[in-house]
From Swiss-Prot:
This is Probable calcium-binding protein CML20. Residues 14-35 are annotated as: Disordered. InterPro entries: EF-hand-dom_pair (IPR011992), EF_Hand_1_Ca_BS (IPR018247), EF_hand_dom (IPR002048), EF_hand_pair_protein_CML-like (IPR039647). PROSITE patterns: EF_HAND_1, EF_HAND_2. Ca(2+) 2 binds at D83, D85, D87, E94. A lipid is attached at G2 (N-myristoyl glycine). Potential calcium sensor. It comes from Oryza sativa subsp. japonica (Rice). One of its GO terms (molecular function) is calcium ion binding. PANTHER family: EF-HAND CALCIUM-BINDING DOMAIN CONTAINING PROTEIN (PTHR10891). The gene is CML20.
């Protein structure tokens, strides 16, 4: 479920051309029984709506697959990791638990999705392939653009993104 972390950063760049049903009333912050602080609530709802494309108030494996462009097995695995009540879906409460409690584990899982060869760093080419898999707004960055992103995040100048640099970048996005 670690990919949820990257969703929070990328959600605003998703294709906006999808027709969307109005969100269920439970997602209205003024009516929500959720205990999240008011300032955090809108971000949670925004991320949840990015996943919940049919507006039924639940995230299915199919919606997870559509969002990430991953395999059926990967999508089912992500849903299962967050699905605390065992109904086969991720509710907004379950997503909140992942976003609040999954912190470091979720970041590590997101980092590992980018680090294709498992060597502990993300190269510009790994970044480029990961962004293609996510297919954000049809974005297809050049190798040079990905190298610029790596350089901007690479605080120690070794030409790659370490996990610590990834954590720092994600905390700035939050």
């Amino acid at each position: 479920m670690g990919l949820v972390v990257s969703a929070a950063a990328s959600c605003g760049r998703l294709r906006r051309s999808r027709s969307r049903s109005p969100p269920p009333a439970v997602l209205d912050p003024s009516q929500s029984p959720l205990s999240l602080e008011r300032e955090a609530e809108p971000e949670l709802i925004r991320v949840f709506r990015c996943f919940d494309t049919d507006g039924d108030g639940l995230i299915s494996a199919a919606e997870m697959r559509e969002f990430y462009g991953c395999s059926v097995d990967e999508a089912e695995e992500m849903v299962a990791a967050a699905d605390r009540d065992g109904d086969g879906f991720v509710s907004i409460e379950e997503l909140r638990a992942v976003m609040e409690g999954g912190g470091l584990d979720a970041l590590r899982a997101a980092f590992d999705e980018y680090d294709e060869d498992g060597n502990g760093v993300i190269t510009a080419e790994e970044l480029r392939r990961a962004l293609r898999r996510l297919n954000l707004d049809g974005m297809d960055l050049t190798a040079e653009q990905c190298a610029e992103i790596v350089a901007a995040v690479d605080s120690d100048g070794d030409g790659v993104i370490s996990f610590d640099e990834f954590k720092a970048m994600m905390s700035k996005q939050a």
